[in-house]
Regions:
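Short, surface-exposed ligand- or partner-binding patches at beta-edge/loop junctions that are enriched
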Residues: 74-76
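Rhodanese-like catalytic fold shared by cysteine-dependent sulfurtransferases
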Residues: 1-32, 39-71, 80-137
Length: 137
């Protein structure tokens, strides 16, 4: 049975925006979440099976590697850069593109599965001294 994508989210200028809960429903049927956050933002990981990581600064060079035959839900931290990438992919001929409205921030607010990767947390007394925190074992 084909996925009736029109029943999910809302569409603005040809791009369909979906919520986190709707994304989970869609991923049960078909598709991948494409996380475009840079490595330093990956402290909170969406704890789901079908997720691929293509950092924002690299996806334009590697978009050809993405599957075209299934739904791709583009996500970042708050939904700004991911929207830009979703539009880029549509312009490159991808027809099954969705955008996660509000990004990981809204995903977490909705109580959806998130894992905290403590090895990626930063430490430092000011922004100029930030570095990865060393985890004592």
């Amino acid at each position: 049975m084909a996925l009736e994508i029109e029943k999910y989210g809302f569409e603005i200028n040809g791009l369909r925006h979906v919520s986190g809960k709707e994304s989970l429903e869609i991923l049960k049927e078909a598709g991948f979440m494409i996380d475009v956050r840079p490595d330093f933002e990956l402290t909170k990981l969406m704890n789901i099976e079908h997720i691929l990581y293509y950092p924002y600064d690299e996806i334009r060079d590697h978009y050809q590697d993405l599957p075209r035959e299934t739904w791709l839900i583009i996500v970042d931290a708050e939904g700004l850069r991911s929207k830009e990438i979703a539009i880029f992919l549509k312009d490159k001929g991808f027809s099954n593109i969705l955008h996660l409205a509000g990004g990981v921030v809204e995903w977490e607010r909705d109580g959806l599965p998130v894992t905290l990767d403590k090895s990626r947390r930063l430490s430092g007394s000011c922004m100029c001294q930030l570095k990865r925190r060393e985890i004592k074992k």
